Amino acid sequence: MTAPTEAAAETADADGFTSLRIKNVVRETDDAISIVFDVPPHLAEHFSYRAGQYLALRIQVDGQEYRRCYSMSSSPVKHQDLRVTIKRDRDGVVSNWLNDHAGPGDRISVAAPEGRFVRSGKDRELVAFAGGSGITPVFSLIQTELAESAGRARLLYANREATSVIFREALDGLVDEHGDRFGLQHHLDVEQGVVTAEKIAAFIAEAGTDADCYVCGPGPFMDTVERALLDAGVPAEQVHLERFTVAPVPTPSSGAQVTETVTIELDRETVTVDYRAGHTLLQMARMAGLRAPSSCETGSCGTCIALVTEGEARLLNNDALDEDEVAEGLVVTCQAIPTSPTIRFVYE
C-alpha cells in the first residue's frame, strides 16, 4: 500500500482520489473485516453519501496498482465515520491483501461515494435479500431506514454456515431495538440447502408485492431471487440489484468478428491504437496512455460512460444506462467489448 503524505489528503488528485487515514479495522468474521476511515471535517461534504453506496479504493500491491469498490456498511444518519466491509475472495488480490495487512494509521486513496443501490420508494416497505458479503450495502440501508422512518424492514440473509454470518450481533441488536418493525430470517446452506424460489416467494408474500426489494450477493443467489420476485408479481422497477462481480470477458470464437483498431477521443485528444483481444474500451483507453474516467469498473456507477460514434460494442454488464441511452450509442466503457472491425468512441 502506498503512503501518501498528510498534505496529499487535503484535496482529491487528478483521478478523483483522496488519501484517508484508517481509524480502525474490525474483524467481523474469520474472512471479513470492516475498515473505518477517519474523514477530516473539511472533507465531510465531499464524502457525504446515501445508504447503499460504495467507495472506490486505490492501492498498490507488489508494485501493481489496483482499484476496487467496496460498499459502505455504515449509515449516514447513525455514523460520522465511513466504514466499508471486505470479505476475502479466494482469488482476490486486494481483498486478501487488505484482510491480511490493513491496520490503523495506514492511508488509502479513496474516491467520493457513488452508487445507485439506494432507497427509492420510501413510502413502500423495504424488503432485502442478502447473500454472504452482500449484506454490506443492505445493512447500511436497513440501519438508515429504521433510524429515520417509522416503516418496517425485512431481511432474508443467506450464508453457507453460522460462522460466516457478518454483523450477526448488530442485526440481533436491531431486532431487539426495533421489535416488530424489523423482521430478520437467517438461512444457512449447510443446514437448509441453497435458497429456493419457493422460499423467496413465501418471504415476499409476507410483505406483499408493493414492497421495495433490494438484492445483493453471489450471482446465482441474485438470479434466483430476481426471478422469484418477478414471478411473484413484484414490478421490475421495484427490484434493485447490486452486483459485486461481473462476468469474465469471453474468449472470441474462431468465427467472431476481429476488431483491428480502436479510436478514443478524450479532452480534445484523439488516439488510435491496435485492439488487443479480450480488452474493454476502458482498458484500451488506458493502454493508449489516456487518463480515462472510471470508478466502480463493474458497469454500475456510470463514471466511464462514452458515446460510440463509429462501429459497435456489446456490454458485459450494465446497471448504469437505460435502453434508450444504449440505443443512442452510449456505453459504459469498463464493460464494453468491440464487435466491429473498427470502433471510435468519445468521452463527453
Predicted regions and their residues:
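Ligand-binding loop in jelly-roll beta-barrel domains
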Residues: 76-80, 121-124, 152, 338-347
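C-terminal accessory/binding modules appended to enzymatic or scaffolding proteins
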Residues: 258-297
